[in-house]
A protein has these predicted regions:
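A short, surface-exposed alpha-helical micro-motif characterized by mixed small hydrophobic
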Residues: 136-138
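ABC ATPase "signature
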Residues: 154-155
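Catalytic Walker B motif of ABC-type/P-loop ATPase nucleotide-binding domains
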Residues: 96-100
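Conserved ABC ATPase "signature" region
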Residues: 40, 44-67
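Conserved ABC transporter NBD signature motif
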Residues: 1-11, 15-16
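Conserved ABC ATPase signature
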Residues: 71-78
């Protein structure tokens, strides 16, 4: 059974979904739309009140001010990830789920997106799905490892680093 803000996912179908923001690995964006236009479109879908102000806030919070009047198709992968993060947060969800949010980024974009995700995590719950242990170390406080759909570990990051010989070693031992 999965709960989001005390509501059962699957049973109380609509309410939990409103409390979750999701950025999939392949970040499906409308490449022919402008950044601001796309975020407004997503905000309308979520029935965000004060849409214009929320779009402006998201553009600022993910650092898209300079890019906001460009077509998404003209953006770099790093800026497209920022658009994806903004759309995932446009309705101010309590929980943000990010699937491989840094894949394919260059080193500069990687540092920027990691920092952005860390700052987002100060205000809301962020769940990060990745197989890259360096990403976990850079962005996470808590680690949950899963093998064949079952949780095999759920610890603070420090415990893995200090007591289990590091994340990669723990991952090998727990998932082999």
């Amino acid at each position: 059974e999965s709960l989001v803000s005390g509501m059962r996912v699957g049973t109380d179908q609509l309410d939990p979904q409103k409390k979750i923001g999701y950025l999939p690995e392949n970040n499906p964006l409308y490449l022919d739309m402008y950044v601001r236009e796309y975020l407004d479109f997503v905000a309308r879908i979520y029935k965000v009140s004060n849409r214009s102000a929320q779009v402006k806030k998201m553009i600022h919070s993910v650092g898209l001010e300079i890019e906001q009047n460009k077509k998404i198709g003209a953006l770099s992968k790093g800026y497209r990830q920022r658009v994806g993060l903004a759309q995932a947060m446009i309705h101010d969800p309590e929980v943000l789920i990010l699937d491989e949010p840094t894949s394919g980024l260059d080193p500069n974009q990687l540092v920027e997106i990691r920092s952005l995700i860390r700052s987002i995590g100060e205000k809301r719950t962020v769940m990060l799905s990745t197989h890259i242990m360096q990403e976990v170390e850079a962005m996470c406080d808590r680690v949950v490892m899963i093998k064949l759909g079952e949780i095999v570990a759920d610890e603070d990051l420090e415990k893995f680093v200090n007591d289990k010989g590091g994340l990669e070693e723990a991952f090998k031992q727990l998932t082999s």
